[in-house]
Amino acid sequence: MSDETTGSLGDAFSPMDTPTTTIMPPPADVDESGFSHSLLTFAAVMTFLIMIVGICGNLLTVVALLKCPKVRNVAAAFIISLCIADLLFCALVLPFQGLRFVQGTWRHGEVLCRLIPFIQYGNIGVSLLCIAMITINRYVMITHYSLYNRIYKRHWIAIMIAACWLFSYGMQLPTLLGAWGRFGYDARLQTCSIMSDRHGHSSKTTLFITAFVIPCLVIIACYAKIFWVVHKSEQRLKRHATKQNSIPNNLRPLAAATSMPSGDGANPSQVPAGCRVSSDSSSNYSTDVPDTTPGGAGGGAGVKQQPSRVKDQREVRAKRNEWRITKMVLAIFLSFVICYLPITIVKVADKDVEHPSLHIFSYIMLYLSACINPIIYVIMNKQYRKAYKTVVFCQPAARLLMPFGKGNGASSAAEKWKDTGLSNNHSRTIVSQMSAGATATATATAAAGTQPQSTSTQGPVQALELTARVPDLISKSSNLPLPQPLPQIPPAGARPSLTPPPPPSVLTATHSNGSGSQRLPLKKNNHSYTNSGFNSSVISANPSSSPSPSSSGGGIYRPGIGSMGNGSASIRRITMVGDDIILEEEELPPTPTASSPPQMQAPPPPPSSSRQTTMNALNTTPKTPIYMNVDSPKRNQSYSERNIPVPAREGHDQGVKDSQGLPSKLMDKKKFPKD
């Protein structure tokens, strides 16, 4: 080749025209690893925020579960272990991870670079194993209840919790010592993690399968079995409810009387005796309580009692509580899987860190799993919310969580009554008591000139309707009758009805024959109303004599004074706790069985003159009695103001008092009870 040719080629490819490859520098807001500064700042803020919420929430949960015995059960022991693992994760791991995001790299030495991932992966394993243990506990409780008490004893529970911690951290020891993989700094992710050793071995896959995949499969299998058993149980309950005519949610008279003479002369109905309590709440269940009145007079042995279902109601309520905890644990497991799933997918799909934002998001989700559990407890469990209140507001645990215990003015018997399945938020309760005894005629019937009839198939019925929001009225004297509206004069030949309608929104206690109406006091300020025997009545030995208000159930009901009957009672106390009505059932010592009263024939109908006298007496307007509000008496009253005697009515009331020969019980009690 000539020199000209060579020169032309050299001119054609001058150094200035030679193509070169230029490497652009990274942007100013991106570090050498590819993570932007704004992204690292966001990750640091979220990490420190999760750390604060996690430490406060998990510490509050541990203190609340240890302080409040109401929520202290087998599941709570594993939940405490879970909270301790999350607390250690938030207190020991997250501060260093937050500083890593702020500084952009790891600057805390090689020892901490090995220790921090050891604690991190160990706590992750403990958390998932504790969730698996709680799920197994729910599985045994719901599907194999007969084995529950034998498996979950205190020493076995301690062994299970210790096994979770030892297994999770024991699996990390070979990696910590460098025998099977090693803990070191990963420059691509700028974090300390599990690295391959000099032989190329790593424990990531084994730890992932052993501490994550297997517990998840066990949890899924247990919940599948739990849902199957619950579904079958609901199907059986629906079939049983269809056969037994499901109980409606509204109030209705659940207990019926024995054979009673009706006001219009209709044939009486035969219903067995017993006592049933039904609450107007969201529950469709009622509780049957057998009549505990000992030895009713007059054919009481032949009356059958209603079967008791208190034990069934306790079992239903316990199963509902267990199912509520089971759903809460399921929510914890789902949140755990959702939080750990992103980092698992990102590390497998993006090994070369081509999308840094996905890695930051996966780390934040991983840290979020340590603080989300207390939030689930607050949302899904009412008892846990109350337990948190006891710690936050420094309230006694017994007063808030055990409103029917000694801390709130009620007795242990009332707490046992609540365990029968009655709802806490019921607004109205009907209590009907059947007594297998002789029939007690009302005062108005005796005043009309008729004599009480007693047969072996007739029994007194007394019903109480307790309304949680009614005026608290009480008469100041037991000799003053309550105001009653004037009855309408019936047409000629018809039997007059002596049943005055009860005043609206006022607590009443009436006989089933409608012979009288009586207002009862009701107090909301956690006051207990004792009853000395209003559930049964006693017939006077002389059939011709008119029964007194005390013996016929016509007296004034007063706190601490049982003037509505002299017989034995099955319900001894009515306690108001907030808006709840607690009925305390108490066994009484047996009393001798009274002899049956003599059988008497029905008297002939009264002559027309006597009937006209009765009608004139009914048309007479009684004196207006004096009432006072028990809830708001005058404060700091003097002795004379509290004990102003009220004159008794002339005529009938004075005669009744003289015939009894005893002073009024209301006048004996000089002071009204304090609020």
From Swiss-Prot:
<comment type="function">
    <text>Required in glia to regulate the acute sensitivity to cocaine and to continuously maintain the proper blood-brain barrier (BBB) function. A moody-mediated signaling pathway functions in glia to regulate nervous system insulation and drug-related behaviors.</text>
</comment>
<keyword id="KW-1003">Cell membrane</keyword>
<dbReference type="InterPro" id="IPR000276">
    <property type="entry name" value="GPCR_Rhodpsn"/>
</dbReference>
<feature type="compositionally biased region" description="Low complexity">
    <location>
        <begin position="278"/>
        <end position="294"/>
    </location>
</feature>
<keyword id="KW-0675">Receptor</keyword>
<feature type="transmembrane region" description="Helical; Name=7">
    <location>
        <begin position="360"/>
        <end position="380"/>
    </location>
</feature>
<feature type="disulfide bond">
    <location>
        <begin position="113"/>
        <end position="192"/>
    </location>
</feature>
<comment type="similarity">
    <text>Belongs to the G-protein coupled receptor 1 family.</text>
</comment>
<feature type="compositionally biased region" description="Gly residues">
    <location>
        <begin position="552"/>
        <end position="565"/>
    </location>
</feature>
<dbReference type="GO" id="GO:0048148">
    <property type="term" value="P:behavioral response to cocaine"/>
</dbReference>
<dbReference type="GO" id="GO:0005886">
    <property type="term" value="C:plasma membrane"/>
</dbReference>
<feature type="compositionally biased region" description="Low complexity">
    <location>
        <begin position="536"/>
        <end position="551"/>
    </location>
</feature>
<feature type="transmembrane region" description="Helical; Name=4">
    <location>
        <begin position="157"/>
        <end position="177"/>
    </location>
</feature>
<feature type="compositionally biased region" description="Basic and acidic residues">
    <location>
        <begin position="666"/>
        <end position="675"/>
    </location>
</feature>
<feature type="topological domain" description="Extracellular">
    <location>
        <begin position="95"/>
        <end position="115"/>
    </location>
</feature>
<dbReference type="InterPro" id="IPR017452">
    <property type="entry name" value="GPCR_Rhodpsn_7TM"/>
</dbReference>
<feature type="transmembrane region" description="Helical; Name=1">
    <location>
        <begin position="45"/>
        <end position="65"/>
    </location>
</feature>
<feature type="region of interest" description="Disordered">
    <location>
        <begin position="588"/>
        <end position="675"/>
    </location>
</feature>
<dbReference type="GO" id="GO:0008366">
    <property type="term" value="P:axon ensheathment"/>
</dbReference>
<feature type="transmembrane region" description="Helical; Name=2">
    <location>
        <begin position="74"/>
        <end position="94"/>
    </location>
</feature>
<feature type="topological domain" description="Extracellular">
    <location>
        <begin position="349"/>
        <end position="359"/>
    </location>
</feature>
<feature type="topological domain" description="Cytoplasmic">
    <location>
        <begin position="137"/>
        <end position="156"/>
    </location>
</feature>
<keyword id="KW-0812">Transmembrane</keyword>
<keyword id="KW-0472">Membrane</keyword>
<feature type="topological domain" description="Cytoplasmic">
    <location>
        <begin position="66"/>
        <end position="73"/>
    </location>
</feature>
<dbReference type="GO" id="GO:0004930">
    <property type="term" value="F:G protein-coupled receptor activity"/>
</dbReference>
<feature type="topological domain" description="Extracellular">
    <location>
        <begin position="178"/>
        <end position="206"/>
    </location>
</feature>
<keyword id="KW-1133">Transmembrane helix</keyword>
<dbReference type="Pfam" id="PF00001">
    <property type="entry name" value="7tm_1"/>
</dbReference>
<feature type="region of interest" description="Disordered">
    <location>
        <begin position="475"/>
        <end position="568"/>
    </location>
</feature>
<feature type="transmembrane region" description="Helical; Name=5">
    <location>
        <begin position="207"/>
        <end position="227"/>
    </location>
</feature>
<keyword id="KW-0297">G-protein coupled receptor</keyword>
<protein>
    <recommendedName>
        <fullName>G-protein coupled receptor moody</fullName>
    </recommendedName>
</protein>
<keyword id="KW-1015">Disulfide bond</keyword>
<feature type="region of interest" description="Disordered">
    <location>
        <begin position="258"/>
        <end position="316"/>
    </location>
</feature>
<keyword id="KW-0807">Transducer</keyword>
<feature type="topological domain" description="Extracellular">
    <location>
        <begin position="1"/>
        <end position="44"/>
    </location>
</feature>
<feature type="topological domain" description="Cytoplasmic">
    <location>
        <begin position="228"/>
        <end position="327"/>
    </location>
</feature>
<feature type="transmembrane region" description="Helical; Name=3">
    <location>
        <begin position="116"/>
        <end position="136"/>
    </location>
</feature>
<dbReference type="GO" id="GO:0007186">
    <property type="term" value="P:G protein-coupled receptor signaling pathway"/>
</dbReference>
<feature type="topological domain" description="Cytoplasmic">
    <location>
        <begin position="381"/>
        <end position="675"/>
    </location>
</feature>
<feature type="transmembrane region" description="Helical; Name=6">
    <location>
        <begin position="328"/>
        <end position="348"/>
    </location>
</feature>
